[in-house]
Amino acid sequence: MAATRGEAKSDVAYGEGREALLRAVVTVVARGGLRELTYRAVAAEAGVTHGLVRHHFGSRDALIVAATEYSLGPAISVTGLGEAGSLDDWARDVPKALTDEEEITAFQFEVILESRRRPELREAVSDLYAGFRKAMLADLRAHGVQADKALATLVFAALDGLIFEGLALNEPQTTRAAIRKLRELLRSAGLAG
């Protein structure tokens, strides 16, 4: 069916629409912050009509929450969290969050900061952090670290800070050096073999 006047022709394959819209939200926010997030901007990025975006999500907040939930999967995947190996391999792929999924990383930090001002986003941010902490606990254990929830939270906070700094300063060598030091700390504390 041809697009009518005022409508964009969809470049999104059937069954991939929701994910394409969520990825478009991530891209729009990563590029211009939440202030740039509109139905029209998401529609233009995804190659669909803005009515379709509104139909799928209903409100701007629902769009942000859904994209925040979506963003956890790619963020965990790119960093290799949960892949078993030796402590020497642990967190080796974390710097990829700054290259392969930079938009996801930037999007998440934008939403996290916005949740300070907008309590309606806090639950989504809380769920995001809970997902990261759960993945970190499993990842530490898969690498032979005797970890509990508190240690997973501490280690995740350190990595999260490194990623935030890396996003702002683009100094991957600093991130890698700090991760090596964190491995040494885990080993010297007797928490890993």
Which residues make up each language-model segment?
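N-terminal intrinsically disordered/low-complexity leader segments
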Residues: 1-16, 193
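Hydrophobic/aromatic residues within well-ordered alpha-helical segments
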Residues: 17, 60, 67, 71, ...
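Hydrophobic alpha-helical connector segments
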Residues: 66, 76-105, 151-155, 179
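Outer-membrane beta-barrel domain signature
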Residues: 72, 76-81, 133-140
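Short alpha-helical scaffolding segments that buttress acidic/His motifs in well-ordered protein cores
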Residues: 94, 108-112, 155, 159-162
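Amphipathic alpha-helical segments used for helix-helix packing
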Residues: 99-129
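Hydrophobic/aromatic-rich alpha-helical bundle segments in the mid-to-C-terminal region
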Residues: 121-122, 126, 141-193
